[in-house]
Amino acid sequence: MAKKSKQLCAALEKIDSTKAYSVEEAVALAKETNFAKFDATVEVAYNLNIDVKKADQQIRGAMVLPNGTGKTSRVLVFARGAKAEEAKAAGADFVGEDDLVAKINDGWLDFDVVIATPDMMALVGRLGRVLGPRNLMPNPKTGTVTMDVAKAVEESKGGKITYRADRAGNVQAIIGKVSFEAEKLVENFKAFNETIQKAKPATAKGTYVTNLTITTTQGVGIKVDVNSL
């Protein structure tokens, strides 16, 4: 514990808490101050000036990062017949119907993404209490309820991330791993930021992005200058 505190203090000394950094500076600092003994995840956290209580100000979606996430997602697909075969051919880790529902209800959760064809949603709906709180419920807005299961599987395996604003207007997302070259992380950030900017509700007033930080697993939050975006 003392060693971890020492590492944290060393990281804090390199970061000026009163300063808002450019994206490039923040990424460089995130890599430099990371003290995890594993390949830590690099994340961004936005605070948006939106009112998610209003239907037209809810932000949710998915995108594929240009350089991936550095993580291999375990993909589960609910499909039958030809669509099930398409999912398997595309690289899905688990494909099934009632058998998977029973397994999940018994407590099995060894997967990261759930995809379903529209005709399977009545079945998948039985898992709402299990999948919903874990943000695993398939949804058309994130491209996980679709007839094009092959594309959905390939995207999920190739760096697709999902995002959603919480009740306070916070949006968090992975943009890669500490082991990524800084340029790759910056490219991923810029792609995600462009998506967030395009998602700005027409009815949102005032400054859209009120706060933005970049951090690593167990790392220190580094404030990004929102005016530099």
Swiss-Prot record:
Cross-referenced Pfam families: Ribosomal_L1
Entry keywords, A to Z: Repressor, Ribonucleoprotein, Ribosomal protein, RNA-binding, rRNA-binding, Translation regulation, tRNA-binding
Cross-referenced PROSITE patterns: RIBOSOMAL_L1
InterPro entries, sorted: Ribosom_uL1_bac-type, Ribosomal_uL1, Ribosomal_uL1-like, Ribosomal_uL1/biogenesis, Ribosomal_uL1_3-a/b-sand, Ribosomal_uL1_CS
SUPFAM superfamilies: Ribosomal protein L1
Gene Ontology annotations for the cellular component aspect, listed alphabetically: large ribosomal subunit
GO biological process, one term: translation
GO molecular function: rRNA binding; structural constituent of ribosome; tRNA binding
HAMAP family hit by this protein: Ribosomal_uL1_B (MF_01318_B)
PANTHER family hit by this protein: 54S RIBOSOMAL PROTEIN L1, MITOCHONDRIAL, LARGE RIBOSOMAL SUBUNIT PROTEIN UL1M
Function field: Binds directly to 23S rRNA. The L1 stalk is quite mobile in the ribosome, and is involved in E site tRNA release.
UniProt record similarity statement: Belongs to the universal ribosomal protein uL1 family.
Quaternary structure, from the entry: Part of the 50S ribosomal subunit.
Protein name: Large ribosomal subunit protein uL1
Organism: Streptococcus pneumoniae (strain Taiwan19F-14)
Lineage: Bacteria, Bacillati, Bacillota, Bacilli, Lactobacillales
Name of encoding gene: rplA
